[in-house]
A protein has these predicted regions:
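Short amphipathic alpha-helical segments
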Residues: 18-19, 76, 106, 128
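Short glycine-rich anion-binding loops that position phosphate/pyrophosphate groups of nucleotides
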Residues: 13, 67-68, 119-122
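Generic domain-boundary/flexible-linker signal
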Residues: 16, 28, 73, 103, ...
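Stable alpha-helical structural segments in soluble proteins, enriched in small hydrophobic residues
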Residues: 48-52, 81, 87, 105
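DPxDG-like acidic metal-binding loop motif
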Residues: 61-97
Length: 129
């Protein structure tokens, strides 16, 4: 089990950064995205590191959402995670955007949930958990 990790989601209209320490969420930030997703991500990560006095070598794994969603956001997130993993010898993993949304509501409950993202006027991504 991974105790210290970061989850990044740039696949939708907001950047979401979540940091867990000892398997408990200690930091969560949600920022509206317009343009310059990479700049917003890097500035947000830098702010988090400064605010929490975070030692990046303590991270066990980094997660990035892998879709469905905005291709450019997914590409920026994956590029950051892969670059970080190479320079810090850290594990990485992908996470469905729909699963990330669902997990924020489930909190280890046994309830079932539908996660839905509107893709276009008549098209939706749907997953059941």
């Amino acid at each position: 089990m991974y105790l210290n990790f970061i989850v990044l989601d740039l696949s939708l209209s907001h950047l979401v950064i979540l940091l867990a320490h000892n398997n408990k969420v200690v930091y969560k930030n949600k920022i509206a995205l317009k343009r310059d997703r990479a700049g917003i991500l890097f500035n947000s990560i830098q702010s988090m590191i400064s605010e929490l006095n975070l030692n990046l070598s303590d991270l066990d794994i980094l997660f990035s959402t892998i879709g469905p969603g905005n291709f450019n956001g997914i590409r920026v997130s994956l590029s950051f995670v892969k670059g970080f993993a190479i320079t810090h010898n850290t594990k990485i993993a992908g996470l469905s955007s729909l699963e990330a949304i669902s997990r924020s509501f489930l909190n280890n409950n046994e309830k079932k949930i539908f996660s839905i993202i509107k893709a276009s006027p008549n098209f939706y991504y749907i997953e059941f958990f």
